[in-house]
């Protein structure tokens, strides 16, 4: 990742979420092992971080490893864990150089203790950075996220600190893994698939969806800028009519 340059203000989402799909297919197309696609995908991560930071996006959430990905071949899962561990150690310095804070969301209990320690260390080492938040979803699933939020609230009710009727969508949202961050405005999926695959199910309620046919390793600077330009061209109505939105913009 290069030293990130500043850019002027532009019409961009506060929070971008990305499903990084197509690493294996990228590798197969080149007659390479699947892990080669995941390694190549790291360059795309760096490129997207650079574009988002330049454009003044506040939060970038990357779907790195879903709770369903444990079902993949053991060799691939092992290679992904090793790559994740290496990237945490290697990229932390670059994140600090660019004032980027790292957060990791998901159920960490299945990860090796050494990897869990590396996650905590990277988060602590970047916690003082304030320019931009890079959030990695690892062993994450949207259904898991909603369930763990409901469990937290149920414990509060059980302890007598909360009444069932006190539970509102707003309160439940604060208990999600992303609770204190703005909701995603834009969700991008690469690889040509048109689904969200159990990613941020609650949080994506009003997000704009953008699908790219590019495999993730090929989704670099120009592709990310194109996605942001497409977002800027859309009118977000949130249930209102176009006339209401336009009138509100003029007010």
From Swiss-Prot:
Substrate binds at residues 22-26, 38, 66-68, 70, 72, 189, 195-197. It catalyses: 8 isopentenyl diphosphate + (2E,6E)-farnesyl diphosphate = di-trans,octa-cis-undecaprenyl diphosphate + 8 diphosphate. GO terms for cellular component: cytosol. The keyword Transmembrane helix does not apply. Mg(2+) binds at residues 21, 208. Pfam families: Prenyltransf (PF01255). InterPro entries: UPP_synth-like, UPP_synth-like_CS, UPP_synth-like_sf. Keywords: Cell shape, Cell wall biogenesis/degradation, Magnesium, Metal-binding, Peptidoglycan synthesis, Transferase. Its cofactor is Mg(2+). One of its GO terms (molecular function) is ditrans,polycis-undecaprenyl-diphosphate synthase [(2E,6E)-farnesyl-diphosphate specific] activity. Its EC number is 2.5.1.31. It comes from the Bacteria. GO terms for biological process: cell wall organization; peptidoglycan biosynthetic process; polyprenol biosynthetic process; regulation of cell shape. Binds 2 magnesium ions per subunit. Catalyzes the sequential condensation of isopentenyl diphosphate (IPP) with (2E,6E)-farnesyl diphosphate (E,E-FPP) to yield (2Z,6Z,10Z,14Z,18Z,22Z,26Z,30Z,34E,38E)-undecaprenyl diphosphate (di-trans,octa-cis-UPP). UPP is the precursor of glycosyl carrier lipid in the biosynthesis of bacterial cell wall polysaccharide components such as peptidoglycan and lipopolysaccharide. Homodimer. Belongs to the UPP synthase family. This is Ditrans,polycis-undecaprenyl-diphosphate synthase ((2E,6E)-farnesyl-diphosphate specific). The gene is uppS.
């Amino acid at each position: 990742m290069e030293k990130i340059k500043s850019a002027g203000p532009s019409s961009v989402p506060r929070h971008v979420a990305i499903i990084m799909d197509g690493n294996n297919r990228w590798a197969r197309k080149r007659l390479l092992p699947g892990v080669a696609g995941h390694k190549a995908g790291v360059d795309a991560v760096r490129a997207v971080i650079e574009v988002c930071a330049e454009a003044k996006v506040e939060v970038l959430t990357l779907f790195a490893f879903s709770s369903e990905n444990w079902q993949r071949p053991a060799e691939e899962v092992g290679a992904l864990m090793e790559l994740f561990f290496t990237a945490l150690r290697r990229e932390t310095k670059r994140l600090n150089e660019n004032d980027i804070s790292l957060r990791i969301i998901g159920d960490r209990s299945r990860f090796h203790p050494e990897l869990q320690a590396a996650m905590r260390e990277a988060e602590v080492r970047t916690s003082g950075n304030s320019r931009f938040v890079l959030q990695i979803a690892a062993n994450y699933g949207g259904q898991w996220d909603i369930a763990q939020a409901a469990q937290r609230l149920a414990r509060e009710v059980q302890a007598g600190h909360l009444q069932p009727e006190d539970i509102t969508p707003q309160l439940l949202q604060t208990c999600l893994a992303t609770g204190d961050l703005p909701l995603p405005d834009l969700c991008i999926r690469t690889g040509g698939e048109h689904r969200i695959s159990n990613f941020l199910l609650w949080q994506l309620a009003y997000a704009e969806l953008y699908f790219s046919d590019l495999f993730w390793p090929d989704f670099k600077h120009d592709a990310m800028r194109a996605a942001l330009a497409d977002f800027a061209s859309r009118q977000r109505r949130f249930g209102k009519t176009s006339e209401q939105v336009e009138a509100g913009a003029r007010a």
